[in-house]
Curated annotation (Swiss-Prot):
It comes from Methanococcus aeolicus (strain ATCC BAA-1280 / DSM 17508 / OCM 812 / Nankai-3). The gene is rps3. InterPro entries: KH_dom (IPR004087), KH_dom-like_a/b (IPR015946), KH_dom_type_2 (IPR004044), KH_sf_prok-type (IPR009019), Ribosomal_S3_C_sf (IPR036419), Ribosomal_uS3_arc (IPR027488), Ribosomal_uS3_C (IPR001351), Ribosomal_uS3_euk/arc (IPR005703). SUPFAM superfamilies: Prokaryotic type KH domain (KH-domain type II), Ribosomal protein S3 C-terminal domain. Gene3D superfamilies: 3.30.300.20, Ribosomal protein S3, C-terminal domain (3.30.1140.32). This is Small ribosomal subunit protein uS3. It comes from the Archaea.
């Protein structure tokens, strides 16, 4: 019973996430966080432009709340919106921008390189972009692009690397977009920082 409930909740979150992505193309939607509370379900929406999530006089956020409750069966949803301060360092925003560009017909290689340049320009330690699916023909393939330093496994990868997966719906089929970003402010467990030792100035008094 617990397993069924867990699966049902995961499916619901996936469907709501896809709904928000399609409903908020101009908001710079990244991801959402769902938490159950004693009075309902709190859904925190992370976006580059919160104004597009709220809408004029709260019209959009009201529509989102009603749809999530009626169509997806979420118990008393309460939507909270948080702005992403550095969108080019947010894996969700970057992945969504790549997916949207692919859906507009832009070449995957050009889109990936452009995204990597923007991320690294913000001081990221490293970034990985993976695009997989039917990119140019009937055969599926995976393209991986990387710059800088990246932890691929272990605890540092899980806790320090921001990663997100989005999909782009193209004529040839669905293309997966995965972005991993190692932010500039983190310190790795095996990173050694060498500090400069300030030189001491000795003052000697000479008596005449």
């Amino acid at each position: 019973m617990i397993e069924r409930t867990f699966i049902k909740e995961n499916v619901m979150e996936t469907l709501v996430d896809e709904y928000l992505k399609n409903k908020l193309p101009r908001a710079g939607y990244s991801h959402m966080d769902v938490k159950k509370t004693p009075i309902g379900t709190r859904i925190t929406v992370f976006a580059e432009k919160p104004g597009f999530v709220i809408g004029r006089k709260g019209k959009m956020v009201k529509e989102l709340t009603e749809t999530i409750a009626t169509k997806y069966g979420v118990n008393k949803p309460q939507i909270e919106v948080k702005q992403i301060e550095s969108p080019d360092l947010d894996a969700g925003v970057v992945a969504q921008k790549i997916a949207s560009s692919l859906e507009r017909g832009m070449h995957f290689r050009r889109v990936a390189h452009s995204a990597i340049r923007r991320v690294m320009a913000q001081g990221a330690k490293g970034v990985v972009v993976i695009v997989s699916g039917k990119l140019t023909g009937e055969r599926s393939r995976t393209e991986k692009y990387m710059e800088g330093y990246m932890k691929h496994c272990g605890e540092p990868s899980e806790e320090l690397v921001d990663q997100c997966h989005k999909i782009a719906k193209l004529k040839l089929g669905v293309v997966g977009v995965t972005v991993k970003i190692m932010p500039p402010e983190i310190t790795l467990p095996d990173e050694i920082v060498i500090k400069d030792v300030p030189s001491k100035t000795t003052v000697e008094t000479v008596e005449e």
